[in-house]
């Protein structure tokens, strides 16, 4: 629901701006100019584990874009947010936190950062190293990608301590890579 709303209202705002100020010069080169939205081109394997119906009126939005264009040629990409998370005291974008407290080093020094609203949300956080596999994470990224018009910076993580000789098997790496492809992850 969240990513549907984000993309929908960004497109709606960009189309309104195009109505006021004209479409961006590259609009004609976009998929949007051809009437193609991210919801039209996502990998349908997503529907096997997320059958959520669209909640917003995409047909009306498609017509609005057809009539007025877009002020922006692209609108969404998800990045790691490593630096900005320090400024805003947020987690690293869509990545699960490594721990409740993390230590981040930069040219300005060392920063100890506690996850937002630790006392209230402590039991709601899923920590990176407690996730048994990347499957659920890749499913979530695939669901997000259904609405994002660029790519998502997504990382798969492996705790070497869980594997023989502390070596992550190539078979597992390939499985996760193919799973990401299957779900339409564009990173």
PLM region descriptions:
Residues 1-45:
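Extended, well-ordered alpha-helical scaffold/bundle regions in very large, multi-domain proteins
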Residues 19, 23, 32, 40, ...:
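Catalytic alpha/beta core of large soluble enzyme barrels
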